[in-house]
Amino acid sequence: MAGILDRKVALVTGGASGIGRATALAMAREGARVAVADRTEENAAGTVALINAAGGQAIAIGGDVTMEADVAAMVARTVAAYGRIDCAFNNAGVAGGSVGPGRQRLHELSQASFDAMLAINLRGVFLCLKHEIAHMLAQGGGAIVNTASIAGLIGLATSSHYVAAKHGVVGLTKSAAIEYAQDGIRVNCVNPGYVTTPMTEEVVQTRLDAVMAKVPMNRMGHPDEIAEAVVWMCSDKASFMTGASQVVDGGYYAA
């Protein structure tokens, strides 16, 4: 039986590990040909090897999502390889403690840390949207999912730069959804809670008990659980869904 992304072409940024890798693999299992992008082609190659070994089709692309020329090249290489882009998962990003010295109150944050966070987590999404949408307009439609966070819906202490960036992703998602709804382009975002990935492991493990106390399911999420939501939003089964923030967080946001 054909998968829900059968014959579609997907572009996944931040595809070397974590949620990005899990989603690229899930898309391939559902029949998509996948362009896996990460900072270097070598980083992306591991995910591509897993897809190809399972009988799927994928290519590796290297590039920095903070650089417009790199993003334009990612889109161009995907189209050159597969002819189109039906769905895109703009997932490249960093955790709150990955830029600068770690958890800091707002008055302690340097401008450099703030700017670096927004460059990766917000400007990167903007640039991907810009170039993906331009191509999708020419081909007559498509579906895009951006990685936001529960931090895009609430405030979190000592993470103001991360929270600002993720709120920005939610805002970009809603605005783009409205602008392009009549062009056949759907734009949504996924808002994960605490998920076990290489990016979050160091940040969360230092305060695991405190984090779990806020999650009604009392566990971390798995990248595959986020991937399933993203795949569905990219598929035609979500044809009436745009501008949405899909929370996948074990109940954190509801508590």
Segments (PLM) and residue ranges:
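Residue(s) in the substrate-gating loop at a strand-loop-helix junction
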Residues: 149
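Substrate-binding pocket helix/loop in short-chain dehydrogenase/reductase
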Residues: 99-106, 110-115, 211
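Short C-terminal tail/terminal secondary-structure segment
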Residues: 154, 197, 214, 231, ...
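A conserved structural motif in NAD(P)-dependent oxidoreductases
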Residues: 215-226, 237
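Canonical Rossmann dinucleotide-binding motif of NAD(H)/NADP(H)-dependent dehydrogenases/reductases
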Residues: 3-35
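Active-site helix of classical SDR
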Residues: 129, 165, 173
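Alpha-helical segment proximal to the catalytic Tyr-Lys
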Residues: 134, 178-182, 239
